[in-house]
């Protein structure tokens, strides 16, 4: 069976090399809106999606993430846009909800010709005092945790062909 959605799922790859060119507002809004259509437990829509294009704030996020990772390189691979997903610490489905949002946004990005890569360590970043200050500056409520982020932009190179899926990846029990 084949259709546009299944084709996009099979073709999307994590990209780790980005052009410096900023994406358009229309492209950004398309990706962000796709995230809002992700399923959330009990339909709560509690996560927050924060797109950062301000160069100074992006630099701060890169530094925070790199410090947690213990590297000096850019954990966001030079992407001009960083999209952060946060969820209430009190929501038992927060990580699941935020993960679905990130997945939908990655698929949407691919479908309109953008590149993305899931980035980790936002949990540690936004548990820190520096992260809490950023959330306050962004007028977000207290009690949020970082779920993950996307490096988002135009690919400067494309990955090699994908390896085949392992044969025992799924099982059908009848």
Segment roles from a protein language model:
Residues 1-174:
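Acidic, surface-exposed loops and disordered segments
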């Amino acid at each position: 069976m084949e259709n546009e959605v299944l084709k996009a799922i099979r073709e999307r790859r994590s990209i780790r090399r980005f052009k410096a060119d900023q994406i358009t507002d229309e492209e950004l809004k398309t990706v962000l809106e796709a995230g809002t259509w992700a399923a959330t437990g009990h339909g709560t829509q509690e996560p927050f999606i924060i797109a950062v294009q301000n160069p100074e704030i992006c630099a701060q996020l890169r530094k925070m993430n790199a410090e947690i990772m213990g590297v000096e390189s850019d954990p966001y691979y030079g992407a001009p846009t960083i999209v952060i997903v946060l969820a209430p610490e009190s929501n038992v489905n927060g990580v699941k909800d935020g993960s679905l949002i990130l997945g939908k946004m990655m698929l949407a990005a691919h479908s309109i010709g953008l590149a993305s890569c899931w980035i980790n360590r936002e949990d540690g970043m936004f548990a820190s005092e520096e992260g809490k200050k950023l959330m306050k500056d962004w007028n977000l409520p207290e009690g949020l945790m970082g779920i993950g982020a996307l490096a988002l932009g135009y690919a400067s190179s494309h990955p090699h062909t994908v390896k085949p899926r392992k044969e025992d990846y799924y099982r059908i029990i009848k």
